[in-house]
Amino acid sequence: MSELLDLSFLSEEEKDLILSVLQRDEEVRKADEKRIRRLKNELLEIKRKGAKRGSQHYSDRTCARCQESLGRLSPKTNTCRGCNHLVCRDCRIQESNGTWRCKVCAKEIELKKATGDWFYDQKVNRFAYRTGSEIIRMSLRHKPAVSKRETVGQSLLHQTQMGDIWPGRKIIQERQKEPSVLFEVPKLKSGKSALEAESESLDSFTADSDSTSRRDSLDKSGLFPEWKKMSAPKSQVEKETQPGGQNVVFVDEGEMIFKKNTRKILRPSEYTKSVIDLRPEDVVHESGSLGDRSKSVPGLNVDMEEEEEEEDIDHLVKLHRQKLARSSMQSGSSMSTIGSMMSIYSEAGDFGNIFVTGRIAFSLKYEQQTQSLVVHVKECHQLAYADEAKKRSNPYVKTYLLPDKSRQGKRKTSIKRDTINPLYDETLRYEIPESLLAQRTLQFSVWHHGRFGRNTFLGEAEIQMDSWKLDKKLDHCLPLHGKISAESPTGLPSHKGELVVSLKYIPASKTPVGGDRKKSKGGEGGELQVWIKEAKNLTAAKAGGTSDSFVKGYLLPMRNKASKRKTPVMKKTLNPHYNHTFVYNGVRLEDLQHMCLELTVWDREPLASNDFLGGVRLGVGTGISNGEVVDWMDSTGEEVSLWQKMRQYPGSWAEGTLQLRSSMAKQKLGL
């Protein structure tokens, strides 16, 4: 679009003249194309008569063009320097510089000159191939964009300087020059003046007159013949300028300015980083946008630029709980509903007090040819009401092949409104090898689609695929139950993979001084090094059965940018080798008793929020930090032993392989 020209200053008559020129140019081009086709056909005819291909074997006694026998000893034969074929003297064309070519090669050169191909072959390497007529035609079709910060006064002044705005203005001006015509503004029955009534219908009038004039000009050019099929209404300008009309009211030239602006007005919270800088100083100071300005200027704050702020999953869950608590207090109801956040991260949060009832009917079949699991969701029976007072439910079914709970692994049916016995009859597919299917668990969950995305959990059911026979498509019906807690021993296995890490604490006495290492703020304390080696058997988050994973770390209780560390993204693998080290300075040995290292694995999504793949927490696992009970001090098993080994042997590496958690919600401690 950068090649388009600004032709807004042209009048409709001038545009019609330009379009007629373009039409003649199109006719000339078609005639020239016909001439070029004729020349190319002549060349093809010469080749068909006697030319041979380079892939064939040529006899030394035959001319490649006329195929005449040359005899055993023929001094007239020689090789054409264009095609390397043997040709006789009669099939040569002498050139001005004394050299010669065969008839076919000479005809090809002549054709290249006559058609102008030599010019276009060079032009295509230097310029984008687009003729001037195409650019002008596209510019005439293109409607100029309105400046975002152009005021009404500036636009009026610009239009006055550029000339006519709409075609009927000349006719109106001629009518105004006549002394017999009086300009009156009568009152209507509604009490409004005709000018006020006209201004109210200004949007529709402007759209009709503009579209009609544009259609007329393009119909004359013949560029859009299909527009002729559409019946266009008569212009209001023609109606108002007809003789005998009473109380004619003419609209001022600024009518285009007062059209309703469809551009969205941004609230302060919706400004982009660069827009925030352009707000008044009082607004900038109130929002404290020093960090915003540093983000909008490249190189001003490199650390902030590198931080691609994906939301932490626990932080999102915490905010969602607070939001639900506030809404329940305001409504005076103790019933808490679950929002779309729970749809993404189903293991966290409160699932409400709805009593789960009903069952789901379905059938399963595995297609060997396509390597796909076919899930036929048929119907649900006797579901619970999401809104008990109004006896209303809008249910839909969502499925996962656990442990994969990513967006790519989610399948959903349509929403059936105002029913507790929905009939779906829909097919959901999962492309997965049969060998891997036995390690998965198919989960059905039924949800009520509420207003504003506040979905309510209605029940779920699971199928262990290792004990399911898929050779025949049989109908099944399972009862729905409530959410199984992650702490419940009867919970389904959720293997998320393993993370291999090594920890080392270097006391302050052994920490190197000087060099490029930053000095800690406290002036004392050692150094905690976290070596993220690799991950094994991660959950596939992308369609191809892979993940673009990275590890993010926090040294709790500090959950801020100073404590945040990230590894590079390892693409298209479920067994990534990170080989990356996190370093925390200014850490004292006695402080490790009250700290916890949280490592989470994420799948990188460039245009959306990242997918949670699993995580671990390394600490003492007492549930207490600095005398306070905290949720994040919940380490168990290998997480505790690896942390204690690192504390027990300062200066040496402590390595361990940790099972990734499927949820970073608080675990039940064996106290």
From Swiss-Prot:
Is Zinc-finger one of the keywords UniProt gives this record?
yes
Membrane topology term reads: Peripheral membrane protein
All residue ranges annotated as the RabBD domain in the record: 4-122
Keyword presence, Membrane: yes
Q: Which residues carry this modification: Phosphoserine?
A: S201, S204, S217, S221, S274, S289, S488
SMART domains in the record? C2 (SM00239)
Q: Which GO terms describe its cellular component?
A: endosome; exocytic vesicle; plasma membrane; platelet alpha granule membrane; transport vesicle membrane
> Out of the domains of life, which is the source?
Eukaryota
Q: Where are the zinc fingers (FYVE-type)?
A: 63-105
Instruction: Output the Gene Ontology terms for molecular function.
Output: neurexin family protein binding; phospholipid binding; small GTPase binding; zinc ion binding
Question: What role does it play?
Answer: Modulates exocytosis of dense-core granules and secretion of hormones in the pancreas and the pituitary. Interacts with vesicles containing negatively charged phospholipids in a Ca(2+)-independent manner.
What PANTHER family does this protein map onto?
A: BITESIZE, ISOFORM I, SYNAPTOTAGMIN-LIKE PROTEIN 4
Q: Describe the subunit structure.
A: Part of a ternary complex containing STX1A and RAB27A. Can bind both dominant negative and dominant active mutants of RAB27A. Binds STXBP1, RAB3A, RAB8A and RAB27B. Interacts with MYO5A.
What is the protein's given name? Synaptotagmin-like protein 4
Q: Which organism is it from?
A: Homo sapiens (Human)
Q: State the gene name recorded for this protein.
A: SYTL4
